Structure formats: structure tokens, C-alpha cells
């Protein structure tokens, strides 16, 4: 089985890549990126660096043959230069690449969305995330796993990629992480946990609903269960 990771230089995408490369079910894990990986990878990982993301769909080939697509591909309004430009990355590029992967036989997609995502939201960010979810579901993959994390924690390689809530929320999130106050801040979660849970769910789809929505609390609970099994 081969996997494909988009957004592998980010918190969640990096988590996808690290945990997918450790899973024996994957023979190869491809990553399409604009820059080199910021962390070491095993020989199982094939990193394809192409700065022009308009060419990315052409890189998803029959030879790659990804059975699972993990996408944490996203930017921020500040990094993109406005919501319209952010939409072209977060929504349009994600959909284009998901469609390309499906045409090459991909059956499972794992999408990082956001807590509060809804296509009818009054808030631009939540509306965009909801529209991504809606349109990914419409592509009709065999298995669709939508992760909805709250504030993301972890060390970022790009200061502009502050994501949900920005640096202040992340700082507060670290303080309440897995505490009795975590609900007040939307269950902050580490990007690596999001990646770990996404890989686990992608490899365990038997008997599950075609479309799975996984909340931030669910991610924390599943991650904790996996840690107990590992020890």
C-alpha cells in the first residue's frame, strides 16, 4: 500500500508523514512539497519538491498509485495575502489534488479540517473549511475521514502559519492541554496527535461509516488509547 501526504511541512501533515512511515502497512509514503522536509525521514518516504503548486496534480501518477491520501494542505490568510488567495490553496488546490488522487485509484482520504467548520458559517474561515468538507465528500471516496482539531499545538517551522486562533491561542492551549479546562478552549491538540490518529483511522476503516467526522476531543481520546496500547 502507498500513501500520499500533502502539507507535510506543517504540524498535522508532518504528523501524518512520521506515523505513516512507521506503519508497516505502507510500502511507500509520497510527499509533494514546495520545500524540503524539515525533519529526517526513512527510506520509505519519497519527497517530491516542486515550488509551483499548479504542477502538483501532474505529479500524482499511476506509478505513485496512492491508496490513501492524507491532506493537511493549508495556509493562513496572512501568509496567502487575503482570504480569496487562502481559498485557492485550502479549497481549490485540495480539491484538485484529491480528484487527481481518486482518478489514480485512491480509495481513502484523510482531511484535516477545523473545529466549527460549516459551509453556512458566518465566519469566513469556518465557512471555507465547511465548503472543503462538503466538496471532498462529493468526490465520493470509498472512505472519508475528516479530522476537526481545535487549537493546534506544536513547534511550527513557519511563524506565519499560526493556524486556528494564532499564537496567543496556542500559548493558552498549551496551558490547558488535557486539563479540566481544555473544553473551554476547544480541546487543544498537538499536530502530531492529529497525524497519528489520522493514520490509525485510515488503516482501520473496516466496519466504519463511509464518512467519519472526528472531533478534537475524539482525537485526544483515540491518541491516548493508542499510547496505552504502545506501552
Curated annotation (Swiss-Prot):
The keyword Amino-acid biosynthesis does not apply. Pfam families: HIM1. Coiled coil: none annotated. CDD domains: CC3_like_SDR_a. The keyword Nucleotide-binding does not apply. Signal peptide: none annotated. Residues 1-44 form a transit peptide. Its main location: mitochondrion. It is found in: Mitochondrion outer membrane. GO terms for biological process: import into nucleus. Belongs to the FMP52 family. Present with 1340 molecules/cell in log phase SD medium. This is Protein FMP52, mitochondrial. The lineage of its organism: Eukaryota, Fungi, Dikarya, Ascomycota, Saccharomycotina.
Amino acid at each position: 500500500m502507498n500513501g500520499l501526504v500533502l502539507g507535510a511541512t506543517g504540524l498535522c501533515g508532518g504528523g501524518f508523514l512520521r506515523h505513516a512511515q512507521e506503519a508497516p502497512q505502507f510500502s511507500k509514503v509520497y510527499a509533494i512539497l514546495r520545500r524540503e522536509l524539515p525533519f529526517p525521514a526513512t527510506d520509505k518516504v519519497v519527497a517530491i519538491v516542486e515550488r509551483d503548486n499548479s504542477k502538483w496534480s501532474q505529479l500524482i501518477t499511476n506509478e505513485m498509485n496512492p491508496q490513501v491520501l492524507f491532506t493537511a494542505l493549508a495556509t493562513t490568510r496572512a501568509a496567502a495575502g487575503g482570504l480569496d488567495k487562502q481559498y485557492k490553496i485550502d479549497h481549490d488546490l485540495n480539491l484538485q489534488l484529491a480528484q487527481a488522487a481518486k482518478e489514480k485509484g485512491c480509495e481513502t482520504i484523510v482531511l484535516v479540517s477545523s473545529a466549527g467548520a460549516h459551509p453556512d458559517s458566518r465566519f469566513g474561515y469556518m465557512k471555507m473549511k465547511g465548503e472543503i468538507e462538503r466538496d471532498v465528500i462529493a468526490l465520493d471516496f470509498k472512505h472519508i475521514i475528516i479530522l476537526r482539531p481545535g487549537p493546534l499545538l506544536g513547534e511550527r517551522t513557519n511563524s506565519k502559519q499560526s493556524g486556528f486562533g494564532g499564537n496567543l491561542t496556542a500559548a493558552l492551549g498549551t496551558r490547558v492541554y488535557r486539563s479540566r479546562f481544555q473544553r473551554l478552549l476547544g480541546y487543544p491538540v498537538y499536530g502530531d496527535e492529529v497525524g497519528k490518529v489520522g493514520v490509525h483511522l485510515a488503516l482501520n476503516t473496516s466496519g466504519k461509516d463511509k464518512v467519519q467526522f472526528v472531533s478534537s476531543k475524539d482525537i485526544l481520546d483515540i491518541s491516548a488509547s493508542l499510547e496505552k496500547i504502545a506501552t
